[in-house]
Amino acid sequence: MEEFQGYLELDRSRQHDFLYPLIFREYIYGLAHGHGLNRSGFLLLDNVDYDNKYSFLIVKRLIARMYQQNHFHICENDSALNQFIGHNKNLYSQMISEGFADIVEISLFIQLVSYLDGKATSKSLNLRSIHSIFPFLEDECSHLNYASDILIPHPTHLEILVEVLRYSVKDASFLHFLRFLLYEYWSWKSLSIKKKASSIVSKKNERFFVFLYNSHVCEYESILLFLRNQSSHLRSTSFGILLERIFFYKKIGGLVAIFGTPFEHIHILRFLKDPLIHYVRYQGKSILISKDRPLLMNKWKYYLVKLWQCHFYVWSQPGRIHINQLSQHSLHLLGYLLSVGTNPLVVRSQVFDNSFLIDNAMNKLETRIPLFSLIGSLTKAQFCNPLGQPISKSTWADSSDSDIIDRFVRMCRNLSHYYSGSSKKQSLYRLKYILRLSCVKTLARKHKSTVRAFLKKLGSELLEEFIKEEEQVLSLLFPRALSASRRLSTGRIWYFDILCINDLANHE
């Protein structure tokens, strides 16, 4: 019940733009702690004591310190604090950052839900899946020619992150507290590097800084969308929030250096008009795909560099943006190699006694598996050598036979699940062969037997385990016709339930 009460209070605080008082609510830190535990150790991977030390007694002491109106008393490393929370001196700061991230995330989510309710566009929930981008690219990229592979620069000044949140968070006290946290983390990071200790910024508060980085990227993308939609949308009411931005036209005036005409003349943006241009962002990279000639892509390239330098004060070199022709180069996207290949098609046309052969080449998006990089990952995980030859997993030899088989089966299932959309299955078959033979060698090593002798004893039963797992996945997709599902297994299958890229050995 307290959780629902917290969400209702967040909604009321958002309506009045007062988020700072929520930092003094105990249930906020309970929500943040629960979210951290539900993320499978994503946040607290190197801080096991955080779960053991967490209690509402610590939360009460934290809130009491914040009521002193002196933020520097919160994180001071006096002896009493160290005795109370052990060797982890930054527990208070970690709790504050997680509570802060929870407040802002939930507040922005409520804004998004209310916006979608008004627009009635919240239908495609499968867009949360990583695989949802590939069917879109199959439909759109087959007739596009050029792609820009863009490495998004990180903000170099902490004040930029605060300025970005000013457009969505109106509470000045909340933003001042955020500024304090950021500068404290910056000093702690420098101190931890000097002492050769683990950085608090890199892992312990990863969710907090990932949220700030995503806010920075969304600001960059909103300006990109703002200019992409041409002069007909510049005065649209849907972009009213963008027009209210402080110094927007002043900062974006750096475009004059490229175009040589004042920015007030909106018609200068018409040269960027391209109805067949698509934008995709993943992790710290983004891709612009277009049908036009390289001239337009080069204009976008130098525009983006100027945008980063003038609006975000980030120095970025043009070398961070690579323009390639899709028919000649491959793009690395979410574990796949993407390229556009030509599929030759000969059509025979006959009119009375005359017949003609017409060559009609069609473009097709090729999705290939980066075999060598995955073999490198398997080598690092000690499943094979650098040449791709399977070896035994010695660290698993002490486990039971069923546990060893189950681990390898899950790894094969993860590979089949994620790379089911590959246009060429040979690479996937080779990876699964490496894992299967590594499983056999691991079991043979455990029983002090040879691979040949072990296969004669348990070969058919072991093979059934792998085949049963794959048929089980396909039968969920095509329950009425398993034979048809086996034929379709050679084609592309995209799953809409994949929310993240798991490591090969994530189920250890």
UniProtKB/Swiss-Prot annotation:
Q: Which GO terms describe its molecular function?
A: RNA binding
**Alphabetical UniProt keywords:** Chloroplast, mRNA processing, Plastid, RNA-binding, tRNA processing
- Main localization, broad class: plastid
Q: Does the keyword tRNA processing apply?
A: yes
Task: Output the Gene Ontology cellular-component terms.
Answer: chloroplast
Q: Which Pfam families match?
A: Intron_maturas2 (PF01348), MatK_N (PF01824)
Where's it found, cell-wise?
Plastid, Chloroplast
UniProt entry tagged with the keyword Methyltransferase: no
Q: Which InterPro entries does the entry link to?
A: Domain_X (IPR024937), Maturase_MatK (IPR002866), Maturase_MatK_N (IPR024942)
Single GO biological process annotation from the record: tRNA processing
Which PANTHER family does the record associate with it? MATURASE K
Briefly state the protein's biological role. Usually encoded in the trnK tRNA gene intron. Probably assists in splicing its own and other chloroplast group II introns.
| Protein family according to the UniProt entry | Belongs to the intron maturase 2 family. MatK subfamily.
Q: What protein am I looking at?
A: Maturase K
Which species does this protein come from? Pelargonium hortorum
Name the encoding gene, please.
matK
